[in-house]
């Protein structure tokens, strides 16, 4: 099965951004980083800081993952700065819609991303994944990603 990465339209980007802000808030609540009260506001602010010009923010790429039947399978947000000293691109967000999960398609989509990142001048890819997202951690390790940092927390009260 072949995949393509197609630029999101402005409307698709706005829907993606809304979903992403909500998801980032939820992930930070689950990880214990933010409280429910502050999570949405902090998530919204983080997105404003990362992509102040929305879809047109410099060196940010927002793609729909599409299969060879033209079905939208998921999304991908990549930051690739050609001037990065280590030629490292960063995956801010990647996911498949529910109907396409659990079929090995994420691996194929990530291979498509590898090719596109190389075309953009990247020599390596980095990402952040929340530790509680064990499925994603396993996928990324299987695809050759290695842990570079581990942040730990101990609850005292």
Curated annotation (Swiss-Prot):
GO molecular function: acyltransferase activity, transferring groups other than amino-acyl groups
Domain of life: Bacteria
Matches recorded under Pfam families: Acetyltransf_1
Keywords: Acyltransferase, Transferase
Gene3D superfamilies (UniProt xref): 3.40.630.30
Every N-acetyltransferase domain range: 3-157
EC number: 2.3.1.-
Database matches in InterPro entries: Acyl_CoA_acyltransferase (IPR016181), GNAT_dom (IPR000182), N-acetyltransferase_domain (IPR052829)
Family: Belongs to the acetyltransferase family.
Protein name as it appears in the record: Uncharacterized N-acetyltransferase YdgE
Species per Swiss-Prot/TrEMBL record: Bacillus subtilis (strain 168)
Lineage: Bacteria, Bacillati, Bacillota, Bacilli, Bacillales
């Amino acid at each position: 099965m072949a995949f393509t990465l197609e630029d999101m339209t402005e409307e698709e980007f706005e829907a993606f951004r809304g979903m992403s802000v909500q998801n980032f808030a939820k992930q930070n609540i689950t990880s214990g980083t933010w409280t429910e009260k502050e999570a949405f506001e902090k998530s919204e602010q983080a997105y404003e800081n990362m992509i102040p010009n929305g879809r047109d923010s410099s060196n940010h790429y927002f793609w729909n993952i599409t299969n060879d039947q033209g079905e939208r399978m998921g999304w991908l947000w990549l930051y690739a700065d050609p001037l990065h000293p280590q030629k490292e691109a960063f995956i801010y967000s990647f996911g498949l819609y529910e109907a396409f999960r659990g079929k090995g398609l994420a691996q194929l989509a990530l291979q498509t991303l590898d090719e596109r990142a190389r075309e953009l001048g990247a020599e390596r890819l980095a990402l952040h994944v929340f530790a509680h997202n064990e499925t994603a951690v396993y996928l990324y390790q299987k695809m050759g990603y290695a842990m570079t940092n581990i942040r730990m927390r101990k609850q005292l009260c």
